[in-house]
A protein has these predicted regions:
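Active-site regions of enzymes building and remodeling cell-envelope glycoconjugates
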Residues: 209-214, 421-428
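Active-site phosphate/pyrophosphate-binding segments
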Residues: 227, 246-364
């Protein structure tokens, strides 16, 4: 029996799946569903092997309580009743002694299901626990793109096959977005389109490119400005489009005057001739599709980099062509009422917002990171593994090692973070619960 489903992972493709259901507790093969016109039956090897993950003998299937030192992973099995009772008792005592903000629910994108990912916020808001400022992944990219494109939306990725140039910037699509490459290669095969890759190292995607620009990390904005300078100087920009649909003005043009390809080359490490070749390809073929990733935004100037790069399809007028424009994220096209899921009707604006990227400093009592509020004395962690992915892991490890920190981890496997927990709760996988994905 085949059951339709959707991939839950933090990948832009949101692949449609067909899952072989062998019984109510066992699955067989996982395949791509051909009905989705974008993913078209293609899925990555990670999801194709989900049978191995869901039936892995090392899965956590029962609640556990720590019996060894923090980090040892030594646990004993307990009942759900025992686990929930201890969690509630500890949280209640901490709230009475330190206030509700001493408890910090912490999560991210282990699943992209709106209920299983964001539902933790309902508990947070109802109980007035500390908020979470989600800074690890997307903030710089989102802000830069909205300044450069206006809204968090882009061109339907199925239009890639109509493009004359497919620019893959700051994402290793051959590994992380296999469907992008399927459509890009179709455009190259049927329309003789050029695949242009901008990244800071020669990855699997770069090896498939017609033109690869290896940019020094953090200098993508300079490359974009150098290209725009060349376009303007050689009258390859779309003046009518700029006048009609953008806020580009004389001040912006003056800004570009000194941003020559020579200037960009000295900063980016890319040859002047390669920058000019890139600009010519775009200027002579404005039906260009820019697939923008997050990689080039994860530094202090990340938003500025994204702003500059997102301005390229505007100065070219690419947006007016089928197969032209840009895509970074299409989140703005969905209009969910998430009041029930997240408890949006009981948000207290006075509750502090703690930076998830500074979890190490927060757990070690940095007053500024804590906004001069109470120490974090308890955490409920879902859908993320901060002991592996958070910045400054030495501080994170030291923070989680505190004997006075009560940590609850909701997880599928015994991760590094789960090994630090006082209580571990078993988490379902996407085929074991209902959810909504966008």
């Amino acid at each position: 029996m085949l059951v339709n489903s959707t991939c839950p992972h933090d990948c832009p493709s949101t692949c449609a799946l067909q899952v072989e259901k062998l019984s109510n507790t066992k699955i067989g093969k996982v395949r791509g569903a051909p009905e989705n016109t974008y993913t078209a039956g293609v899925i990555c090897s990670k999801v194709a092997r989900y049978k191995e993950r869901i039936h892995d003998p090392n899965r956590i299937l029962k609640p556990m309580k720590r019996v060894g030192a923090k980090g040892s992973g030594r646990m004993m099995t307990i009942t759900w009743e025992e686990a929930l009772e201890e969690i509630c008792d500890k949280f209640t005592k901490i709230e009475r002694e330190y206030g509700s903000e001493a408890i910090w629910p912490y999560y991210y994108a282990g699943t992209m299901g709106l209920v299983m990912r964001d539902g933790i916020n309902r508990l947070r808001h109802e109980k007035k626990y500390s908020g979470e400022h989600q800074t690890i992944c997307t903030n710089q990219a989102f802000n830069g793109y909205m300044v450069g494109a206006g809204k968090m939306l882009g061109v339907d990725p199925t239009e890639i096959k109509e493009s004359d140039n497919v620019v893959i910037w700051g994402t290793n699509a051959a590994i992380t977005q296999v469907n992008v490459m399927s459509h890009a290669n179709e455009a190259r095969r049927t329309k003789k389109a050029k695949i242009i890759v901008v990244d800071s190292y020669r990855n699997a995607t770069a090896k498939q490119a017609d033109l690869f620009l290896c940019v020094n990390p953090g200098t993508d904005g300079a490359l974009a400005c150098g290209v725009m300078h060349y376009l303007v100087k050689n009258n390859l920009h779309d003046i009518e489009y700029l006048k009609t649909f953008t806020d580009f003005n004389s001040e912006f043009m003056a800004h570009l005057e000194k941003k020559t390809p020579d200037w960009a080359s000295s900063i980016t490490g890319i040859k002047k001739t390669d920058i000019e070749q890139f600009a010519k390809l775009l200027g002579n073929n404005p039906r260009s599709y820019f697939r923008l990733g997050y990689g080039f935004t994860r530094q202090k100037n990340g938003a500025s980099n994204m702003h500059a790069v997102a301005s390229l399809p505007a100065i070219l007028g690419s947006w007016k062509y089928k197969g032209g424009g840009a895509l970074m994220n299409n989140g703005s096209i969905y209009h969910w009422d998430k009041t029930l899921i997240e408890g949006l009707d009981c948000i207290d604006p006075k509750i502090r917002l703690l930076d998830q990227s500074r979890i190490g400093e927060i757990l070690l009592g940095n007053k500024e990171a804590l906004h001069a509020g109470p120490p974090v004395m308890a955490m409920l962690i879902q859908n993320t593994n901060p002991m592996s992915v958070a910045p400054d892991l030495n501080k994170v490890n030291k923070g989680f090692s505190r004997n006075d920190l009560f940590t609850v981890v909701h997880e599928q496997f015994m991760t590094d973070t789960a090994k630090m927990a006082d209580i571990v709760l078993p988490a379902t996988m996407f085929l074991e619960h209902d959810d909504v994905y966008q």
